[in-house]
Amino acid sequence: MDTQGFSCLLLLISEIDLSVKRRI
């Protein structure tokens, strides 16, 4: 498992989650 890719994916998910919360 690629830890660097996993952390990057987590960062992307958290950023999308923030944008979704801002829209609502």
Curated annotation (Swiss-Prot):
Entry keyword set: Cytoplasm, Secreted
Lineage top rank: taxon: Eukaryota
Compartment list: Secreted; Cytoplasm
UniProt xrefs under InterPro entries: Humanin (IPR028139)
Similarity annotation: Belongs to the humanin family.
Stored PANTHER family: HUMANIN-LIKE 13, HUMANIN-LIKE 4
Protein name: Humanin-like 13
Source organism of the structure: Homo sapiens
